[in-house]
From Swiss-Prot:
It is found in: Cell membrane. The gene is rny. This is Ribonuclease Y. CDD domains: HDc, KH-I_RNaseY. Its main location: membrane. Signal peptide: none annotated.
Length: 515
């Protein structure tokens, strides 16, 4: 039993050994077989790759050969074309050279002909010179004049004739130009006058204030005339109370004073309370109202003309012109009219319309303060325009509008013409009123020339002048001497009919407030 088991064990062991050995060699055989197969496949792949590389190499070589062949053909074609172009250029050059040779030959022939003609001309000139010399000698012998003398005589006669003909021609041209210019100027001026229709209002030196009843006259006069004296002293106007029913008259050559007095008196009559303190309050209030109105009037005038950007002080001065007259003509309306006329004529001549209007509006601006500042209104206007930085052409228009200097611009000439047109219209001005006003202004200016004078008022149609002095500078004794000195200067400087009463008023006020 044990032997059987041992035999079985040996058999099994041998079987296992044989199986393992066979398995080992079988697997080794399979592995070697696979390796050989893989090596064969690799060799095959390498062979195929080598064949493909060889084929690709041949293909690339063929393409390169084809490219080289094509490039060679293109280069040969380009060379052939360039050669043909060079041949054409060469043929043209040869043709041009042949033409140049022909022209050179022709030029040489012409030059030869010219030389021959030049010789002939020189010979002819010599012959002519000889003939001329003989003729000159013969003429000198016959006329008794040398050639230089004859030349001078001939030139003198010709120059005189040309000068005479030129003078006639210039005179004719000047006459034609003047006629044409006059015709054109008349057309422009007539057109400007037709387009500009301005109102003419004759200014007066009196204003009438209506009253509710005649009893109001007594209240205006006041106790012992204190109200009327206070009113006249503060306003600087004459208050005339006569038999005119329900009305009193304010008389003054200064329209601004008269307007202030009219407004103040109207307010006093409406209020009903009339006494010195109230009169002073109302006069001051009226002055402020008139100042505001002056500003508004100036703005309205500038707006009406279409002039913008004026300095506020120039606007105020324009408004003051409403209360200023020149030979009876309202200066503000005159200035607006001049601006319109100058603008219309500038439009016709195609020059600067706004410059012409601005110069026309401001040309008489000096008249707004000429009774306060010494000197002609033109110089005052120029100084004001410079002070408020107006354009130099506007300043020139103001300076040239009365012909004090020669106008250098077309606009300045137009302002000058417009000023003359506005002033020369029938009924626009009255000489008598202006002369009267100027006499009163001179009367006030004489009094104001003394130191210590605060305000002056010429009243009673210039037969009386009231001088309000500064009490801190002029005492009572000095007031007497001042009145005498002013009267003497008036006698010396002014011509006037009759007598002028000089009244010096000195007032001292002490004001305290109870708290």
């Amino acid at each position: 039993m044990i032997e059987i088991d041992l035999t079985s064990f040996v058999i099994i062991t041998l079987s296992l050994a044989v199986g393992l050995t066979g398995g080992y060699y079988g697997r080794r055989f399979l592995a070697e077989s696979r390796i050989r197969t893989a090596e064969e496949e690799v060799a095959k792949m390498l062979d195929e790759a080598a064949k493909e590389v060889e084929a690709k190499k041949k293909e690339i070589l063929l393409e390169a050969k084809d490219e080289i062949h094509r490039n060679r053909q293109d280069a040969e074609k380009d060379i052939r074309e360039r050669r043909r172009e060079l041949d054409r250029v060469e043929r043209r050059i040869i043709q041009k050279e042949e033409m140049i040779d022909k022209k050179t030959e022709n030029m040489e022939k012409k030059e030869q002909v010219l030389l021959e003609k030049e010789k002939e001309t020189e010979k002819t000139q010599q012959d002519l010179q000889m003939v001329l010399s003989q003729q000159l000698k013969e003429l000198e012998r016959l006329s008794g004049l040398s050639s230089e003398e004859a030349k001078e005589l001939l030139l003198y006669n010709v120059s005189q004739q040309i000068r005479q003909e030129t003078a006639v021609l210039i005179r004719n041209i000047e006459n034609e130009a003047k006629e044409e210019a006059d015709k054109k100027a008349k057309n422009i001026v007539s057109l400007a006058i037709q387009k500009c229709a301005a109102d003419v209002v004759s200014e007066s030196t009196v204003s009438v204030v209506p009253l509710p009843n005649d009893e109001m006259k007594g209240r205006i006069i006041g106790r012992e005339g204190r109200n009327i004296r206070t009113f006249e002293a503060l306003s600087g106007v004459d208050l005339i109370i006569d038999d005119t029913p329900e009305a009193v008259i304010l008389s003054s050559f200064d329209p601004i004073r008269r307007e202030v007095a009219r407004v103040a008196l109207g307010n006093l009559v409406s209020d009903g309370r009339i006494h010195p303190a109230r009169i002073e309050e109302m006069v001051e209030k009226a002055r402020k109202e008139i100042e505001q109105e002056i500003r508004e009037v100036g703005e309205q005038a500038a707006f009406e003309v279409g002039v913008h950007g004026l300095h506020p002080e120039l606007i105020k001065l324009l408004g003051r012109l409403k209360y200023r007259t020149s030979y009876g003509q309202n200066v503000l309306r005159h200035s607006v009219e001049v601006a319109h006329l100058a603008g219309i004529m500038a439009a016709e001549l195609e020059v600067d319309i706004m410059l012409a209007k601005r110069s026309g509006l401001l040309h008489d601006i000096g008249k707004a303060v000429d009774h306060e500042v010494s000197g002609p209104h033109v110089e005052i206007g120029v100084d004001l325009a410079k002070k408020y930085r107006e354009n130099k052409d506007v300043i020139h228009g103001i300076e040239a509008h009365h012909g004090d200097i020669e106008p250098e611009t077309v606009e300045a000439v137009l302002v000058q013409a417009a000023d003359a047109i506005s002033a020369s219209r029938p009924g626009a001005r009255r000489e008598t009123l202006e002369t009267y006003i100027k006499r009163l202004e001179k009367l006030e200016n004489v009094a104001e020339s003394f130191s210590g004078v605060d305000r002056t008022f010429a009243i009673q149609a210039g037969r009386e002048i009231r001088i309000i002095v500064k009490p801190e500078e002029i005492d009572d004794l000095h007031s007497i001497n001042l009145a005498r000195d002013i009267a003497a200067k008036i006698e010396q400087d002014l011509d006037y009919p009759g007598q002028i009463k000089v009244v010096v008023i000195r007032e001292t006020r002490s004001v305290e407030y109870a708290k």
